[in-house]
Amino acid sequence: MIVEALNNPFDAEFNKVSSDKSISHRCAIFSLLSDKVSKISNYLEAEDTMNSLKIIEKLGAKVEFKNGVYLITPPKKIVSPNAILECGNSGTAMRIFMGLLAGCDGFFVLSGDKYLNERPMKRVASPLMQIGAKIDGRDCANKAPLAIRGGELNYFAYNSSVASAQVKTALILAGLCSAGCKFKEPELSRDHSERMLLGMGAQISQSGLEIEVKPLKGAYLKPLILDVPNDPSSCFFYAVAAAIIPGSKIIIKNILLNKTRIEAYKVLEKMGAKITYTKTSSTYEDIGDICVQYSELKSVDVNQNISWLIDEAPALAIAFACANGVSTLKNAKELRVKECDRIAITVAALKKCGIEAVELEDGFSIKGGKPNSATIDSHGDHRIAMSFAILGLKCGMNIEKSEFIATSFPKFSYFLRELGARVED
């Protein structure tokens, strides 16, 4: 992908941008817990989320698309498929399906692309195995392909060492489908699963950082009836664009306003960007509009609520690179085990653009400056590719392996062009 620098500021308003990826995955997976048809509109039609629909079909669900709505009819009982369950590039799908299938009768094999199959899965596999799950795979069940022999699991209480919505969701599902559980995390991670499952009728209670889950015991949850809002993580790229291109402004409508999903916007606000939030509705989640206007950015130190902005870290690095002073991100070691080592790759790419950047063990330090045009290897990481495309609006950029953007945001280039950018895919 080649992105040319913008010659003029932009003033844009986006309505349907990119449906929320986290919620779309969960809509597909959680629909299996009901005995009635779930109706999902505005489902994200990206490679990863469409793979989740294909997986639930292999598990016995019927998926239809009618008049812009996905109708998901769950099976009476999850079936043991005769094919591998392909998760593509999605760690979210693989980890959540692990939790669900560990407590279901049957034999299941989860696999992904060459990047996903090198990512660590032990953080989910280990606690599941401690409560009786039968999981095997490469590197002692740390790497996919993973074979799961599902069955009844024991009640468990688990203290997680990481704040991860994926780990939490996997263990909540394992508890729901077996004997129940208690789960505690070191800090609050994104909470879509609890909100959605509570809305479906699950018995989940929370006290501080601890969640208690009552088992379904053969009962079913209510179906999901949901219009998936815009994804704040995907939309954040355009928020950064507005914040770094002088005179620019963007309004993003129908966007998820969950506090665990807009932390990166709060950081951008602390840096000086003018941002307003307007809530327009609330069903499972608060939904509304976000307006971002350019203002000269100042440096910031970020070391709290990291799990709330972990996906936006590469895009935040672009804002850091365009700010006055030295900005730091810490307590983000999780970035080392994403689609690539996002700390090392982000720092190396910024250096190629003439920006002073330093790797920290758990983050990075970036001195803002005037970036240069460069050729960047995204290492097959969709968020690295999109982040440096945004920097390209300021100085021009050539991004290699940009085809992986389609795993999460197929229309990314379309909306860049809507800002006035010249883009060659």
From Swiss-Prot:
Positions annotated to bind 3-phosphoshikimate = 21-22, 26, 164, 166, 311, 338
Q: Which Gene Ontology terms cover its molecular function? A: 3-phosphoshikimate 1-carboxyvinyltransferase activity
What are the record's GO terms for cellular component? cytoplasm
Q: What is its EC number?
A: 2.5.1.19
Binding of phosphoenolpyruvate: at which residues?
21, 91, 119, 166, 342, 383
**Reaction catalysed by this chain?**
3-phosphoshikimate + phosphoenolpyruvate = 5-O-(1-carboxyvinyl)-3-phosphoshikimate + phosphate
Keywords for the protein's UniProt record, in alphabetical order: Amino-acid biosynthesis, Aromatic amino acid biosynthesis, Cytoplasm, Transferase
Question: Main location per UniProt?
Answer: cytoplasm
Would you say which domain of life the source belongs to? Bacteria
Q: Which GO terms describe its biological process?
A: amino acid biosynthetic process; aromatic amino acid family biosynthetic process; chorismate biosynthetic process
Query: Pathway membership of this protein?
Result: Metabolic intermediate biosynthesis; chorismate biosynthesis; chorismate from D-erythrose 4-phosphate and phosphoenolpyruvate: step 6/7
**Which range is the signal sequence, renumbered to this chain?**
none
- Where in the cell does this protein reside? Cytoplasm
Q: Catalytic positions?
A: 311
Q: What does this protein do?
A: Catalyzes the transfer of the enolpyruvyl moiety of phosphoenolpyruvate (PEP) to the 5-hydroxyl of shikimate-3-phosphate (S3P) to produce enolpyruvyl shikimate-3-phosphate and inorganic phosphate.
PANTHER family named in the record: AROM/DEHYDROQUINATE SYNTHASE, PENTAFUNCTIONAL AROM POLYPEPTIDE
- Quaternary data: Monomer.
Concerning its family, UniProt says: Belongs to the EPSP synthase family.
List the protein's name: 3-phosphoshikimate 1-carboxyvinyltransferase
- Can you name the source organism? Campylobacter fetus subsp. fetus (strain 82-40)
